[in-house]
Swiss-Prot record:
Record protein name field: Secretory-abundant heat soluble protein 1
Segments for region (SAHS-c1): 31-60
Compartments reported by the entry: Secreted
Region annotation SAHS-c2: where it falls in the sequence: 75-103
Family the UniProt entry places it in: Belongs to the Secretory-abundant heat soluble protein (SAHS) family.
Organism (species): Ramazzottius varieornatus
Lineage: Eukaryota, Metazoa, Ecdysozoa, Tardigrada, Eutardigrada
Length: 169
C-alpha cells in the first residue's frame, strides 16, 4: 500500500480511504439526526500527538505531519450509514458505506483491508486491519455538545483531534 494512501486515510478516517464511493446517494433520503456523532463536522486547530501517530505508522513527518483542514459527514440512509471524509488541500474526498457491527472488506492497491464500525456508550468506533502493514488502527468519535473528539490509536500511540459542528455541505 502506498504511503500517500495511508497518509490521506489518517488525515480523516482510516476506513474512508479504502471504501468505495456511495452508489446512488440521495441527499433527500439522508438522515442527519438520531446519533450524536451523525452530522457535518469541521476540524479545528486543536490536535494532540498526531506527529507521533504518523511516525508509529512509519510515514515521513515532513510529508504527512501537521494539521490539514478535514471534514467529516456521517449520515444514515435506509439501514446503512455513510462516512464521508474530505481533505480539500489534498484534493481528497471519499465515502464509506457501513452497517454497525458488520465487518466490511475492500481492496486498495491489491491490499485487503478489513474494517468494522461499532457503537459503544453512544460513541462511534472504527477498527481497521491493514494486514500488509501489520497494523490495527482504532478510531473513536466522542461528542460533547457541538464538539467531536476523534481519538486515533495504533499500537501504544494515541493521538486526538477535535471537530466542531458545521453547517457547510
Amino acid at each position: 500500500m502506498s504511503r500517500a494512501a495511508v497518509a490521506i486515510a489518517l488525515l480523516g478516517c482510516v476506513v474512508a480511504a479504502y471504501g468505495a464511493p456511495a452508489e446512488g446517494h440521495d441527499d433527500a433520503k439522508a438522515e442527519w439526526t438520531g446519533k450524536s456523532w451523525m452530522g457535518k463536522w469541521e476540524s479545528t486547530d486543536r490536535i494532540e500527538n498526531f506527529d507521533a501517530f504518523i511516525s508509529a505508522l512509519g510515514l515521513p513527518l515532513e510529508q504527512y505531519g501537521g494539521n490539514h483542514k478535514t471534514f467529516h459527514k456521517i449520515w444514515k440512509e435506509g439501514d446503512h450509514y455513510h462516512h464521508q471524509i474530505s481533505v480539500p488541500d489534498k484534493n481528497y474526498k471519499n465515502d464509506v458505506n457501513f452497517k454497525l457491527n458488520e465487518e466490511g472488506t475492500t481492496q486498495h492497491n491489491n491490499t485487503e483491508i478489513k474494517y468494522k464500525y461499532t457503537e459503544d456508550g453512544g460513541n462511534l468506533k472504527a477498527e481497521v486491519h491493514v494486514p500488509s502493514r501489520n497494523k490495527v488502527i482504532h478510531d473513536e468519535y466522542k461528542v460533547n455538545g457541538d464538539e467531536l473528539e476523534k481519538t486515533y490509536k495504533v499500537g501504544d500511540v494515541t493521538a486526538k483531534r477535535w471537530y466542531k459542528k458545521s453547517s457547510s455541505s
